[in-house]
């Protein structure tokens, strides 16, 4: 892959103003500022373990709640992902990861298929982690999957601590997406589909 796989997205609505810069072939560097501390922590982990360089600046109506900012960040990140990945020539397409964090174990399987779907099987026993509603993690991953045109299966295999469960899920997503976006040395620049297009 000789061309840079980078993208910049600036998405503005009446509820949020989000700028994202993404480099799929980075070193895991990030600058994340969404105004939501725990969400920043998760996005930093996503960049670090995906080896993506990622800058996110999000301003949203946090005085209402965090929903719009979290969902719109997922949408904008998905848009950046689509633009950066290009025509998908030579990528592995599929990725999977099992990631532990103490007692928690999360599995993520990814397919950069052009067919957006999220299967979510994660159970949080608390409504919030810090100030963030735990139901918003599913909203983020759904918004990302739909906008990035990827299939994601996110499954909690074990865990009791909600912080650990969330973090293991983000790290597993990072590793699965890293695998799926990497160059396949045997693919010789081919589209990874029998249809010839994704």
Swiss-Prot record:
Pathway: Amino-acid biosynthesis; L-histidine biosynthesis; L-histidine from 5-phospho-alpha-D-ribose 1-diphosphate: step 6/9
Signal peptide: none
Catalytic reaction list: D-erythro-1-(imidazol-4-yl)glycerol 3-phosphate = 3-(imidazol-4-yl)-2-oxopropyl phosphate + H2O
Alphabetical UniProt keywords: Amino-acid biosynthesis, Cytoplasm, Histidine biosynthesis, Lyase
Keyword Plastid: no
Pfam families, per the entry: IGPD
Subcellular location: Cytoplasm
GO molecular function term, any single one: imidazoleglycerol-phosphate dehydratase activity
GO cellular component: cytoplasm
EC number(s) on file: 4.2.1.19
First-listed, main subcellular location of the protein, grouped into a coarse class: cytoplasm
One GO-annotated biological process of the protein: L-histidine biosynthetic process
Assigned protein family: Belongs to the imidazoleglycerol-phosphate dehydratase family.
Protein name: Imidazoleglycerol-phosphate dehydratase
Name of the encoding gene: hisB
């Amino acid at each position: 892959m000789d061309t840079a796989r980078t993208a910049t997205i600036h998405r503005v609505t009446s509820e949020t103003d989000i700028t994202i810069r993404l480099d799929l072939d980075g070193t895991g560097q990030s600058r994340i500022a969404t105004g939501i501390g725990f969400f920043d922590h998760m996005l930093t982990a996503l960049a670090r373990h995906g080896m993506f360089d990622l800058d996110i600046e999000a301003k949203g109506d946090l005085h209402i709640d965090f929903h719009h900012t979290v969902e719109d960040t997922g949408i904008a990140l998905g848009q950046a992902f689509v633009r950066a990945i290009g025509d998908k020539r030579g990528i592995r397409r599929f990725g999977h990861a099992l990631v532990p964090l103490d007692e928690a174990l999360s599995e993520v399987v990814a397919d950069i298929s052009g067919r957006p779907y999220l299967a979510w099987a994660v159970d949080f026993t608390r409504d919030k982690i810090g100030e963030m509603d735990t139901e918003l993690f599913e909203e983020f991953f759904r918004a990302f999957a739909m906008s990035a045109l990827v299939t994601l299966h996110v499954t909690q295999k074990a865990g009791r601590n909600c912080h650990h469960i969330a973090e293991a899920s983000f790290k597993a997503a990072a590793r699965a997406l890293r695998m799926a976006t990497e160059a396949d040395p045997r693919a010789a620049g081919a589209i990874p589909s029998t249809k010839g297009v994704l």
